[in-house]
Amino acid sequence: MRGRDEDTGEFRGASRSQQRREALEIFDLGEKLVALTPAQLAKLPVPESLIPHIEESKRITSHIAHKRQLAFLAKHMRREDDETLAAIRDALDANSDTARREVAAIHRVERWRERLLADGDAALAELLEAYPAADRQQLRQLVRNAIHERAKNKPPRAYRELFQVLRDLSQEQGLESGDSGLEDGESALEDDE
C-alpha cells in the first residue's frame, strides 16, 4: 500500500515520478502495438480484451482523437498484470531483432552486388571462393549485363536478377546467418571502402 511506513517513516510504493514513467512506457508500448500489422499482432501474446482497443486506435486518424484512444488503450493495458506486459515487450523485441537481422542480410547482399559491379572478376573470385556452389558463368553474365544496362540507361533487369541470385545463394549457403565465410567477405567489403 501507499503511504508512510509507521515504523521507519519512509514512503511505501512507487513515487509519482516513477508511476508517470511506467505509464509513459505502457503508452509507448500501446503505440508500438497499434503500429503493427494484423499478422504481426497475431503473433504476439496480446490479451483478447485489448484487441478491440488496438483496432479502434488504428481506425481513428484524427490526431487528438487518436492520442485520446491511445491513452484509453494504455489505461486498459495498465489493468493487465506485469507478466503479460513483459511477455508483449519481449515478443516485440524479438520481432525487431528479427527484422533488423533481415535488413542487415539484405544490405550484405546489396554490398556484394555493388562490389561485383565495381570490382568485377576480383570480387567474383572472392565470392566463388567463399561460396563454391555459385554459378560462375551466370554471375559473370549478370554482372556484365548489369554494367551494360547502367551504361545505356536501360531498365535494371540484370541488376535485379543479380540481387535475386545473390539472395538465393545467401539463403542456401548461410550468407545471412554468418556461415561460410561471410565475416571474411563482409570485412573485405569494409576494407575496400
From Swiss-Prot:
Pfam families hit by this protein: DarP
Subcellular location: Cytoplasm
Composition skew (Acidic residues), residue ranges: 181-193
Cellular component aspect of the GO annotation: cytosol
Keywords tagged on the record: Cytoplasm, Ribosome biogenesis, RNA-binding, rRNA-binding
GO biological process: one example: assembly of large subunit precursor of preribosome
InterPro entries according to UniProt: DarP, DarP_sf
Chief localisation class: cytoplasm
Compositionally biased intervals (Basic and acidic residues): 1-10
Region spans: Disordered: 1-20, 171-193
GO terms of molecular function: ribosome binding; rRNA binding
Listed NCBIfam families: PRK05255.1-1
Family: Belongs to the DarP family.
HAMAP family: DarP
Role summary: Member of a network of 50S ribosomal subunit biogenesis factors which assembles along the 30S-50S interface, preventing incorrect 23S rRNA structures from forming. Promotes peptidyl transferase center (PTC) maturation.
Name of the protein: Dual-action ribosomal maturation protein DarP
Upper classification of the organism: Bacteria, Pseudomonadati, Pseudomonadota, Gammaproteobacteria, Lysobacterales
Gene behind this protein: darP
